[in-house]
Amino acid sequence: MTDRYDAVLVGAGIMGATLAALLHELDPAMRLLMLERLDGPALESSAAANNAGTGHAANCELNYTPQQADGSVATAKALAINAAFERSLEFWATLRERGELDTPAFLNSVPHISFVWGQGDVAFLRQRHQQLSALPAFAGMEWSSDPAELAEWMPLVMQGRGASEPVAATRISRGTDVDFGSLTRLYLQDLQRSGALELRTGCEVNDLTRKSNGDWSVELAGGERVQTPFVFLGAGGGALPLLQRSTIPEAKAFAGFPVSGQWLVCGDNQLASRHLAKVYGKAKVGAPPMSVPHLDTRFINGERSLLFGPFAGFSTKFLKQGSLLDLPRSVRIGNLLPMLQVGAGNFPLVQYLINQLRQSPEQRLEALQQFLPQAEASDWTLSVAGQRVQIIKNGPKGGQLQLGTEVVAAADGSLAALLGASPGASTAVTTMLEVLERCFASRLATPAWQERLKALFPSWGGDVLSSRSRNTAVLGL
């Protein structure tokens, strides 16, 4: 007899775990199945060492506030990302208050700093500060172009730096570092203890087919099948091939562009302990979002570490532990032309990736020394980061490369997939609430679910910033 579940979640990363946690909070009676092809949860892009950036709140990531023709900066994307991360904090604060989530195990206070040099970039950062600091979401943003003050904010960055060109920085002290791998495991452990979730690892999904009764039949490696009225594909780069196998019409418009990454990791613990900040610079023209250079304090499984990068690369794999055939296998008649159009129309990006692939160890050290003038090669080792699959979407103007995430859902709400990358994990709660809105709309509108949502999110139905002081106090930020 085929097992039947209320929901099947493919991929044991932060997205699927967040959706499982939300579903359980809204309906504790739901029977959930999570399928993971690897031997444990959060081993791909959710892992702290694989994630291109953590604690994204648009505090310091300059690519979220592009400069416009009149010299001002666009703020809409930064505000949306900031609100999305605040929603995550609100959810964690509620679970913390209930004693259901050990937030210190994954959440740490780390200041967020934007750092630039050169007259043009200093002027850009000043304009960004003037606009953002006037908004409630960024009211705590500090500005400085004083080298002595900057040395207090980030001593290693200023140590040994010449005075030949202007420098400036902004800082938000309420920044965070989030170990999404640890958070994923905490969510899943709690769900498994409750009996609501069955997690199967080492279990690959081969196919998805729609049955006459509206259920999905999910075929596993080995031939076993499970049935469910709802499937979520949260398998990172592996979501696109599974979405294509579902054959829903909404999948036809999409293709993927894989981008790999590498970090320089500091092997000197004493050196790493002298830097406590996420320091983001300004990306080069044509660079994908995951390649914005930053000197990044991270807490990985409780240990403080220091990373620089990521350096971009190219691989045809859709997952770090994927196959080189992932990209060619994803090509369809409907997405081949959009893929070719993106390749032809994004020459700066292609050129950037080629240059990154050609980088020597000496060139990577030079890039690091722009942030740490006294960095020595012997203190740093090169490590492979996670794999990202950016969205290629066919539209009225042909194939377009989308640098972000998108929820793709069947018209009847029976299946949803998350495609793309950046800001990703930091917006998981908001993104999974979108999945609920699109796939569980009727239940979401019921008084019972609305009451539970209001309990989980005190600001529900209003301005998420109204919960900021409460979130700060509960989470100790």
Curated annotation (Swiss-Prot):
Functional pathway: Carbohydrate metabolism; tricarboxylic acid cycle; oxaloacetate from (S)-malate (quinone route): step 1/1
Cofactor or coenzyme needed: FAD
GO terms, molecular function: 2-hydroxyglutarate dehydrogenase activity; L-malate dehydrogenase (quinone) activity
Catalyzed chemical reaction(s): (S)-malate + a quinone = a quinol + oxaloacetate
Key words of the record: FAD, Flavoprotein, Oxidoreductase, Tricarboxylic acid cycle
Superkingdom of source: Bacteria
Gene3D superfamilies: D-Amino Acid Oxidase, subunit A, domain 2 (3.30.9.10), FAD/NAD(P)-binding domain (3.50.50.60)
BP-aspect Gene Ontology terms: tricarboxylic acid cycle
EC number: 1.1.5.4
Matches recorded under InterPro entries: FAD/NAD-bd_sf, MQO
Protein family according to the UniProt entry: Belongs to the MQO family.
Protein name according to UniProt: Probable malate:quinone oxidoreductase
Lineage of the organism: Bacteria, Bacillati, Cyanobacteriota, Cyanophyceae, Synechococcales
